[in-house]
Amino acid sequence: MNAVLENIENSEARFRFTIDYKVFADALEKTYRKNKKNYQVAGFRKGNVPRSVIESQYGPTVFYQEALDLIMTEEYKKAVESLALNTIGDPDIEVGEIEKGQELSVKASVPVVPEVTLGQLEGIEVVMPKAREVKERDIDKVLEELQYKNKKITDKEIAPAEKGDTVTVDYDCELDGTKFEPVVDYKALLDDSSDTMGFEGQLEGAQKGDILDIKKVLPHDHPQPQIAGKTACFKVTVKKVERIEILPLDDAFAQKVGNVSTMEEFRAEIKKNLEQAAAQRVQMQRNNAILSELFKRCQVKIPESLIMQRAMSMLEQFSGQLEAEGGTLDLYLQLINKKSGDFKREVWEDAENSLKADYILDKIIKEKGYTVSEEELNQGCEKFALSINMSPENARQKLGPLVHKVEHDLKAEKAFQYLLEHAVIREDNGDKTA
């Protein structure tokens, strides 16, 4: 085997290596023996067709790909080790034309651990915004959300729908001769402020099992001009009518939902939680400002393949959270009025920045020689266990390989703490100068 490094650019290594033909020939024979039972050719019993006959019938390259798969991981690993490359991620591999008896020529490119050049770590200036003051209306809003979350639902089997009820329907829609995909299990809230689809107001009096034909003239100022003023025809099947009962905000509600004795105590607890959340948001803004300035002072180039992997992981995680709450990414983007392309660009930027932070902090860890004591690691494991709803008892043993993640995170916290301690932080006093 020969391996030659062509270049390392933008944290991606490009290199060539060779594979001895005998290694490939042995893999071809193994592949043939494994697969010959699957081939049947006239004049031979199934499973006993000679390799030369199979190759003449199905082409000389019939076993090439599987044979390459059989040897490539090990041969690639040897090449990487001989070049002393610190690789991350999966490689792109291209095998040259294969000639019998000649060693195989392979081209490979793979992300490598980015080189980080640290700049001045001390003296990063940030303005610390003030935490937003929690007002009574903020507490009221939380209580309203808790009221709705803890609502009492009664199935109205035969009673007609009234204002305040939720009606579950399936519906078809036709507009200007175009039929749209049927919608299943749409929940319509019969209330003056909710007329999302345009037919909710006409569901009053409907009962389970009713099939309604509803026409709705779309407003002339509809955001989609091509359908403004046109008539939408809905065929609606009522599947369920439910009465929603909102519990009063009294001491009984506080005891049931807040696990405290009085509503006064509950409001105080909510205020405390809101203040903590506001302080955390300010802290996050401060940390992001420090990282943003750090990126300007340090040099690191993240491979696009790594950014793609991180961005896809972030998208999958976010989509999973939405689905767990009964939503979808498309619906979320509609609600926040954002285009898919713009959202994905933001995710890409977030992924790139998170990777930059990871590698810069890793470099600081090495430069400063940060370590984690046994006591710190045990406490970190207990804290991490609680964060994933695991008992903290014997957390270090239970977490297994995740202990390495905990240890690394603790070192990264120390690295960031160094930046924080040596930053120049000014409080935003709210003054505006012309």
Curated annotation (Swiss-Prot):
Q: So what does this thing catalyse? A: [protein]-peptidylproline (omega=180) = [protein]-peptidylproline (omega=0)
| Biological processes annotated in GO | 'de novo' cotranslational protein folding; cell division; chaperone-mediated protein folding; protein transport; protein unfolding
Report the InterPro entries cross-referenced here. PPIase_dom_sf, Trig_fac, Trigger_fac_C, Trigger_fac_C_sf, Trigger_fac_ribosome-bd_bac, Trigger_fac_ribosome-bd_sf, Trigger_fact/SurA_dom_sf
Query: According to the UniProt entry, what is the EC number of this protein?
Result: 5.2.1.8
Keyword set includes Nuclease: no
Q: Which GO terms describe its cellular component?
A: cytoplasm
Localization, per the record, is: Cytoplasm
Key word Nucleotide-binding present: no
Q: Which residues form the PPIase FKBP-type domain?
A: 164-247
Enzyme class, top EC level, equals isomerase
Secretion signal span: none
Keywords for the protein's UniProt record, in alphabetical order: Cell cycle, Cell division, Chaperone, Cytoplasm, Isomerase, Rotamase
Q: Which Gene3D superfamilies match?
A: 3.10.50.40, Trigger factor ribosome-binding domain, Trigger factor, C-terminal domain
The GO terms this record gives for MF are:
peptidyl-prolyl cis-trans isomerase activity; protein folding chaperone; ribosome binding
Question: What does the protein in this record do?
Answer: Involved in protein export. Acts as a chaperone by maintaining the newly synthesized protein in an open conformation. Functions as a peptidyl-prolyl cis-trans isomerase.
State the domain notes. Consists of 3 domains; the N-terminus binds the ribosome, the middle domain has PPIase activity, while the C-terminus has intrinsic chaperone activity on its own.
State the family named in the UniProt similarity comment for this chain.
Answer: Belongs to the FKBP-type PPIase family. Tig subfamily.
Would you tell me the protein name for this molecule?
Trigger factor 2
The source organism is Desulfitobacterium hafniense (strain Y51)
The gene name reads tig2
